[in-house]
Amino acid sequence: MTLNMMLDNAVPEAIAGALTQQHPGLFFTMVEQASVAISLTDARANITYANPAFCRQTGYSLAQLLNQNPRLLASSQTPREIYQEMWQTLLQRQPWRGQLINQARDGGLYLVDIDITPVLNPQGELEHYLAMQRDISVSYTLEQRLRNHMTLMEAVLNNIPAAVVVVDEQDRVVMDNLAYKTFCADCGGKELLVELQVSPRKMGPGAEQILPVVVRGAVRWLSVTCWALPGVSEEASRYFVDSAPARTLMVIADCTQQRQQQEQGRLDRLKQQMTAGKLLAAIRESLDAALIQLNCPINMLAAARRLNGEGSGNVALDAAWREGEEAMARLQRCRPSLELESNAVWPLQPFFDDLYALYRTRFDDRARLQVDMASPHLVGFGQRTQLLACLSLWLDRTLALAAELPSVPLEIELYAEEDEGWLSLYLNDNVPLLQVRYAHSPDALNSPGKGMELRLIQTLVAYHRGAIELASRPQGGTSLVLRFPLFNTLTGGEQ
């Protein structure tokens, strides 16, 4: 019988018989040289054969194993219920597969994955039990180590305050920690990365962005940082190709408090700059008033000198006139410059945002500030801080006057528009104009700028070559209009 004939018949018994006839001892040689531990017992579970791999695994020689029950290898580490299940299955003449903790001759314990099959004769009677087992101690140790590492990593990730997420090449989340899940829940169940509108593919490795997101109705600022992770394919078809599309690790930290502190620091510096500008404007206005007052007697002295004749020899008159002129010159030199920063073009929306942030705490249920613009793209030109000081002076004055009228809730409307190259700011309120013009501030003598807000506003507006209008509103209240040129060309300078 040839091998082709055996394949045509396709009968396992015939194939085995033919191979045995053509190659006597083939199956014995295969079992002897197999790397899998194989043992054979009789129907009473006494060992009748064990291959060399079995002997190496257990530490016993074949002579020591023959006629021994496999319980020789049993250890107390295997639960009794496992053995009960095994024998219940085998007595039903069904194969059983499971894991056992065996004990080698030297006392060492090892974990085996074992298959036991009842062997029946042609009459269906049980003759043998065939067992094949593999030592899986090393693979089990590695598996448990990996599981422990994963558990430890998950515990660490879930206990750090930052949100950690891993995304694939399509920006799909493949792993995240508890903090990220919490962020998503606070966003109403929406994906945080979608709400942030951030894509790691558009961010370079190690790049960081600070982005706002609305969480439970409040704006939070989150720092997003990305790192590329090398990918290893999990598909069996790519066993020989150790590569896969790269993934990206993203760490998202809440930096709202830090940003608020930075913003508060910036606002504090802005307040200091505005205060310095107001103080310089107050000093300049006071010196200008002094110059005007001093100019009258000096003019009178000059007229007296002309009447007496400049060469009349009136030493006292000449000395008084010269002292007056020198005093005027000294005062002129003492007038501080209002050039605190360079003229520039800047967007108006952040300008109003700063104004609102500076006065947010001073407006309550009885005081309302409404800001509108004709276009969100409006810009201003000049010294930004000084123009902000103009509005601040007016708000300070209006709030102080409104405090003297507690029966009337304060309403302030600020509107901005561009008109033929001029920026017009309309400040309307419900404080009577008479109150604005003639109100006296008790702090005028001990606080710079108190009680002279309108004069300081005029000084700053004039310095920017602007215009100011103050009038009563038909429906009651006061309307202040400030106009500033948007380019130097309107005032004779360069654009």
From Swiss-Prot:
Required for the inhibition of NifA activity in response to oxygen and low level of fixed nitrogen. Its cofactor is FAD. This is Nitrogen fixation regulatory protein. Gene3D superfamilies: PAS domain (3.30.450.20). GO terms for biological process: nitrogen fixation; phosphorelay signal transduction system; regulation of DNA-templated transcription. Residues 94-148 form the PAC domain. The lineage of its organism: Bacteria, Pseudomonadati, Pseudomonadota, Gammaproteobacteria, Enterobacterales. It comes from Klebsiella pneumoniae. Residues 23-93, 151-174 form the PAS domain. SUPFAM superfamilies: ATPase domain of HSP90 chaperone/DNA topoisomerase II/histidine kinase, PYP-like sensor domain (PAS domain). The keyword Transcription applies.
